[in-house]
Amino acid sequence: VLREDFLLTGTKESCGEGECGACTVLVDGHPMNSCLVLVAELDGKHVLTVEGLARDGRLHPLQEAFLEVGAVQCGYCTPGMLLSGIALLNLYPHPTREQIRKEMEGNICRCTGYARIADAIQLAAERINGKD
């Protein structure tokens, strides 16, 4: 529905089984694999896709950090990584590497860019919440 009816193509379609995280969206602030959610289950809920991250033409600080540290390789996993990363930052304002690893384990990067993704999350945390 997101891609075909609303033309929100940032949410990627990949495994269709909730295994890869490429289709991650935030539902009421919580990451969910959109491939596993029925539209009827979302009635009255706030759904955020990667298209909704930028505000007034400015990228979200996590998007900026991804670009700055080179956390984007092929880019296919990036929308899901960003949304899961934002949920993580809402949960842990100053996440440790272990917290990042645990919270991001539902998102797969086939290019193995995990270290830079974690770097970007920690950089964004510093910019959003100040240094710990």
Tell me what each language-model feature is:
Residues 1-132:
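Signature of N-terminal electron-transfer/Fe-S-associated modules in redox systems
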